[in-house]
Amino acid sequence: MTFTIAARCSRTGQAGLAIATASLAVGGLCPWFTSNGDVISSQAYASKRDGERIYRAMEEGRTAREAIEVPRIHDPDIDYRQLLVLPRDGDPLAFSGDKCRPWSGHQIGGDFIVAGNVLAGERVIAAMAEAFRGSETYDLGERLLRALEAGRYSGGQALADGTALTERSASLCVLGAGEERAVRLHDLRVDMHHSAVNEMRRLFEVHKVHGVYADSRDLRPDQTPSMVVFEAEALRKGGVFASRPSCYR
């Protein structure tokens, strides 16, 4: 009950993943990120063990193609799994087991993978791929989120009888480039919500503002005001912080 995009940005060198599902707390279940900034997802009948197997293999220096084969050797239920591996260098790879619930499948582009299971149809991942390809001028986080939104608007999750399922959790992670390829520029999670993709959009817009402040605390602590002062000024200006939760009770 999941749709996912893992992608690299050729313009910035960043990489990341966005995922949404009817299950809860997907950000702690499916995605993995190596110290080299490689992106992994283990989903469908999700196995943390398979995700960890791929992660460990890549940390040990195996190629993405070698790493994605490790669960297929050790997991007797591999046909229930869907696996995505997006290395920083090299071809993206994916596997969709024969026993994943329909509609299930994946599409691989030069710098991305879109995949899902228990979907309204192949049109869901096709729309995600089109949204990603058509947004090259935007930052990677925006492109990933647009792809997720396109998947939802194209039917999202649905049972075989056509019953639609809502997305109750979502996750968005963007990793840096170069020497900071393992640094998480965005690491956002919606663990339980009646409309997780919409909530992720709200959270993303707020984090774009708050993230600038967080970067200032990291890089220029001697020039950065306290959070209380920052949020008071942000609330005064309005914008995305208007009517949002703040550190004030």
Question: What would you call each of these model-derived segments?
Answer:
Residues 1-249:
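N-terminal nucleophile
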